[in-house]
Amino acid sequence: MGDKKSPTRPKRQAKPTADNGFWDCSVCTFRNSAEAFKCSICDVRKGTSTRKPRINSQLVAQQVAQQYATPPPPKKEKKEKPERPEKDRAEEERPDINPPDEHPVEQRDKDKSEKEQPEKEKKDREKEIIPAITKKPNSKKNRPKSDIHQSPPSERNSIQSGKSTTKTKNSHNSRPKLKNIDRSTAQQLAITVGNVTVIITDFKEKTRTSSTSSSTVTSSASSEQQHQSSGSESMDKGSSRASTPKGDLSLGHDESF
């Protein structure tokens, strides 16, 4: 045992010689000079092996004053008050532990019904939005027709009568077919509302419709002019016939005298 301790002793003595007499405080680990008998920070004597610091009376007094400055009694009263109702609550909650388990099915049904109602409302709104969107292209298609055929009232009357006949026909058919439209000029527009996508196809009118309508108007106008001219010719002939017998009568009277 003595042999083991012998090599450790010279090592302890060698440290101060290597550090030129400086020593580390065993409490605050501050490196003091060799001349200092006590630590310059914590006033611990040189060579003490304990790390327990000395109790400073001033610091202890300050800490005690801070502890008593905060009012601990109201905290204790708050803790004591809920302790009594907690026991009462525990007794009241014991019979109520089972009832929430008895009605889980009703709560689930209510939750499902509440979730289904907004979903149905969303679907109804989407259905209302879709027809409003589908009506837009029809209004666009009808506008150019009114712009093209704004000449005489006779054409408007004929167009209105044609529209009325087409409406009556379309009322019977579930899906009306579009007429006087070039299928080659198809423009598709995709509109998405929520999870529903609506595709709208726009078609342009044929150029022949305007020429045929103008030709029909000109033919009707020419027929009216022919009727008027024939009526005027018949009136001229009647007037000439009525004038000739009067002249003959006048001549006969002259001859008799």
Curated annotation (Swiss-Prot):
Protein purpose: May be implicated in the regulation of the transcription as a repressor of the transcriptional activity of E4TF1.
- Is Repressor found in the keyword set? yes
In which compartments does the protein localize?
Nucleus; Cytoplasm
* Keyword annotations of the record: Apoptosis, Cytoplasm, DNA-binding, Metal-binding, Nucleus, Repressor, Transcription, Transcription regulation, Zinc, Zinc-finger
Q: Which domain of life is it from?
A: Eukaryota
Zn finger (RanBP2-type) ranges are 19-48
Basic and acidic residues: which segments have biased composition?
74-129
Q: Where is this region: Disordered?
A: 1-24, 45-257
The family database entries (InterPro entries) matched by this protein are listed as: RYBP/YAF2, YAF2_RYBP, Znf_RanBP2, Znf_RanBP2_sf
Its predominant location is nucleus
Transcription regulation keyword on record:
yes
Taken from the UniProt entry, a GO cellular component term is: cytoplasm
User: Which GO molecular function annotation, any one, does this entry have?
Assistant: DNA binding
GO terms (BP aspect): apoptotic process; positive regulation of DNA-templated transcription; regulation of DNA-templated transcription
Name of the protein in question: RING1 and YY1-binding protein B
Question: Pfam families given for it?
Answer: YAF2_RYBP (PF17219), Zn_ribbon_RanBP (PF00641)
Chain intervals with Basic residues compositional bias: 169-178
Q: Where is the composition biased (Low complexity)?
A: 209-233
